[in-house]
């Protein structure tokens, strides 16, 4: 069941909370421990659902909203597989200590003070949410899209929908919306694009399956956009269902790096 959890931390000032570093810290909690592969983990109920560390594929968890003040730090963690919520809860019960940084003595040490489920929906409920016709989309972190090893420069409703559909297919193919019709979406969905381009640095793992990059500098999108659709159109209804899932996951490529 897709679930969103907000975790509060006691934190020092100046937490080096880049998305990539936060994702790395979170993966140390939720991924399989180093040296344990999926085949061996499948024999143990407490490990079978945890994703392998270092895999380039989309993981069943992602970062959401962040907030911080002088002494507290909070992060939303989104789950497509709620069994990982039990993993997070077990970690919290053992103190919830998280190191964020570059792996040096200057790392910030955070101590979890509270974890709370803030949103939850069944796949059946998400599949029925097809009545919305307008969306305000804010990109929380720099977001980039690629296909067959090549970057996709344009940010369109179909691009976002395809990314969300891939996640839905991975975690619940039975209830997933049908295959995206890009032409139909382009004809009924209008976009006001307030995003801008930025450049981020990234090195792809060899086992990512996303192709080797010719450059470590990758174009990304930041900002927000508004999308509106023709009421009653099938493509609008499909987009509505997919956007319902966006509350529990992320979009784009290279998300295993925290983007």
Which positions does each model-derived feature cover?
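RNA-interacting cores
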Residues: 1-259
């Amino acid at each position: 069941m897709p679930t969103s959890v907000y975790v509060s931390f006691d934190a020092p000032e100046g937490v080096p909370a880049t998305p990539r570093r936060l994702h790395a810290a979170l993966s140390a909690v939720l991924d399989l421990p180093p040296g344990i592969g999926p085949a061996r983990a499948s024999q143990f109920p407490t490990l079978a659902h945890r994703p392998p560390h270092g895999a380039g594929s989309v993981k069943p968890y992602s970062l959401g909203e962040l907030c911080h003040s002088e002494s507290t730090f909070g992060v939303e963690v989104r789950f497509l597989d709620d069994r990982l919520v039990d993993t997070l809860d077990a970690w919290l019960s053992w103190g919830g200590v998280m190191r964020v940084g570059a792996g040096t003595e200057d790392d910030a040490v955070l101590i979890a003070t509270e974890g709370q489920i803030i949103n939850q929906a069944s796949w059946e409920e998400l599949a029925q949410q097809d009545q919305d016709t307008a969306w305000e989309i804010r990109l929380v972190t720099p977001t980039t899209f690629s296909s067959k090893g090549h970057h996709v420069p344009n940010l369109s409703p179909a691009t976002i929908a395809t990314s969300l559909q891939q996640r839905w297919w991975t975690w619940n193919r039975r209830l997933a919306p049908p295959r995206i019709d890009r032409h139909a979406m382009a004809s009924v969905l209008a976009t006001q694009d307030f995003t801008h381009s930025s450049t981020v640095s990234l090195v792809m793992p060899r086992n990512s399956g996303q192709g080797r990059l010719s450059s470590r500098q990758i174009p990304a999108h930041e900002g927000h956009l508004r999308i509106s659709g023709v009421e009653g159109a099938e493509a609008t209804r499909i987009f509505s269902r997919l956007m319902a899932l966006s509350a529990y996951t992320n979009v784009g490529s290279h998300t295993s790096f925290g983007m």
